[in-house]
Amino acid sequence: MPHISWAQHRPADAQRGVFMGLVHALTSTAYGRELGIQSPRDISRRKDFVKRLPVVHYDNLKPWIMRAMKGEKHVLWPGDTNWFAQSSGTTSDQQKWLPVTKEALWNGHYKGGKDVLAQFCAQVPDAQLYQGKHLILGGASSLVQESATTWKGDLSAIIVRHLPPWCEARRTPC
């Protein structure tokens, strides 16, 4: 858990590292090229970021998302975007699809869960958390294939379908 401790003690450095990683990824995408972002140096400062990367509505990103959903690589994220999660539609009645990458699953959802479990075990060492099964509740479990390389559905279906082995071994229901 050294990375958690480091982030707690140096939050600005931790956030800057995440920010620069995202900026670097943006330079490898069609969206980044469209915005004229060739190098992380182009938006390494806050004022450059605000100027070059405007706040947009879903409808502005929808054509980019649809390109990725059809299987095009390097659109909004480097490489493949294999999954698209249906939003709950809180801003309008329209169905919205949110890109979910392998990196988002592993570095966000799964890493976050692992970090929470590690913190819990460190604070409650006699909890016997790993003595039995873990109940995992989710929404709809089916995914619909959209193209040869992309699927869409509920975020919980995407997460549960690709659980890491350390989690899958203890999951219930299976």
Where in the sequence are the language-model features?
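Nucleotide 5′-phosphate-binding alpha/beta core
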Residues: 1-86, 92-174
